[in-house]
């Protein structure tokens, strides 16, 4: 008897059909190089797709170059990142899985800031210049 009869059945999300209901949540690997997809990242996500995951949500993916949560984060802040993402997407699609980025942006909390091109530390920032107190 199958305890979870729908687990391996397709599911439609909007216009997209996912081959099963096995979803991989975002898990940081810090394998990107200054925001760019690396071969190690492609291998990592392709292995999960090959193993049967239906939908993969990538790790933190920054949307602006002046704010990175960790130096090994992925990015899509400009078109120079597209070739790596195309390679990653093709590798995951090869095994019938879908993939989407976990979009990451700064918020009202202060965090250390790393610039993608230098990985140097900047002062804490917040959206619109509004900063909430740091938690204790």
Annotate each language-model stretch with its function.
Residues 1-136:
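Flavin-dependent oxidoreductase catalytic cores
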């Amino acid at each position: 008897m199958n305890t979870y009869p729908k687990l391996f059945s397709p599911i439609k999300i909007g216009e997209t059909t996912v081959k099963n209901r096995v979803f991989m949540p975002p898990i940081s690997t810090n394998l990107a190089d200054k925001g760019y997809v690396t071969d190690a990242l492609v291998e990592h996500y392709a292995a999960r797709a090959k193993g049967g995951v239906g939908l993969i949500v990538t790790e933190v993916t920054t949307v602006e170059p002046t704010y990175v949560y960790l130096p090994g984060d992925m990015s899509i802040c400009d078109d120079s990142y597209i070739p790596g993402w195309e390679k990653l997407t093709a590798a995951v699609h090869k095994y019938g899985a879908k993939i989407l980025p976990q979009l990451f942006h700064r918020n009202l909390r202060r965090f250390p800031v790393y610039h993608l091109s230098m990985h140097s530390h900047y002062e804490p920032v917040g959206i619109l210049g509004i900063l909430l107190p740091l938690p204790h």
